[in-house]
A protein has these predicted regions:
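Short N-terminal targeting/anchoring amphipathic segment
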Residues: 9, 24-45, 54-64
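Acceptor-binding helix/loop patch of EC 2.4 sugar-transfer enzymes
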Residues: 2-8, 31, 59-93, 139
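Nucleotide-activated donor-binding/catalytic signature segment of Leloir-type glycosyltransferases, i.e.
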Residues: 186-190, 197, 203-226
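Conserved donor-binding loops in enzymes that form glycosidic bonds
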Residues: 134-135, 165-170, 198, 221-222
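A short, basic/aromatic alpha-helical/loop segment that forms part
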Residues: 140, 168-175, 188, 202
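Conserved donor-binding/catalytic core segment of Leloir-type glycosyltransferases
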Residues: 151, 157-173, 179-183, 194
Length: 226
């Protein structure tokens, strides 16, 4: 659903709800939950959440709001509020409101997102909307890290400073802008740039990197967490 084209993604989100509910009944029918945790995308799991809450009346439902959809699709020009695309927007906007209503708490990625959700959804109790950033505190450690070994492992220059960009590579991340930034630094010899990630726009970035043949840029599809 998250790494497909726009049409397939939209159709997939519509049918995903039915598939999830069917799987929940089949494999977790006798399991009881204390917390029902789910994230966006997708926003089309309202019936699944309702069913899970009916089976687990004392469970708390918590929405991790990573994407504010469909508004982000409007911002990217993929949908419009009016016209034919507006029909699609209104369908998903209704789904979004339903998902908010069934959630006991809504965790947003930033204070700005909290403010946006509260302002554009006045029917929601503002007290249930809070910050739940998609990150964690990095613990200080005395463990010795073999930085030289890491650079050799990934064929990175030993003496140069390395700048790293990592994460999802989809439409919202503005990969064309990232490419423009890389164009501006591709001939630098005093530093090195590492790009790591995956998503619907990865191929576009990979094609450019291969064509640029820059010694200052390294692109990785995936790296181990440790």
């Amino acid at each position: 659903v998250t790494k497909t084209n726009v049409v397939e993604k939209g159709v997939g989100q519509v049918f995903l709800e039915y598939q999830f509910k069917k799987a929940l009944k089949k494999y977790f029918g006798t399991v009881r939950f204390d917390v029902i945790l789910y994230s966006t995308p997708p926003i089309t799991l309202t019936r699944v959440i309702k069913y899970a809450k009916q089976c687990n009346p004392s469970a708390m439902s918590y929405l991790l709001l990573k994407d504010i959809f469909p508004q982000n699709a409007v911002d990217l020009g993929m949908l419009t509020i009016r016209g034919l695309k507006g029909v699609v927007y209104k369908f998903f906007r209704r789904k979004e409101k339903e998902l908010y209503r069934v959630s006991d708490f809504i965790g947003c990625m930033s204070p700005a997102n909290v403010k946006y959700v509260r302002e554009h959804n006045p029917a929601i109790n503002p007290g249930i909307v809070e910050i739940a950033p998609n990150s964690f505190e990095v613990l200080s450690t005395r463990e010795k890290i073999d930085w030289l070994g890491i650079r050799k492992k990934y064929n990175l220059p030993i003496e140069k400073p390395v700048f790293i960009y990592g994460g999802n590579m989809g439409k919202p991340q503005g990969i064309p802008f990232l490419i423009e930034c890389l164009k501006a630094v591709k001939d630098r010899e005093d530093c090195h740039f590492v790009v790591v990630g995956n998503g619907t726009e990865y191929l576009k970035l990979e094609t450019w990197v291969n064509g640029a043949n820059s010694k200052a840029i390294s692109l990785f599809h995936h790296l181990e967490r440790e």
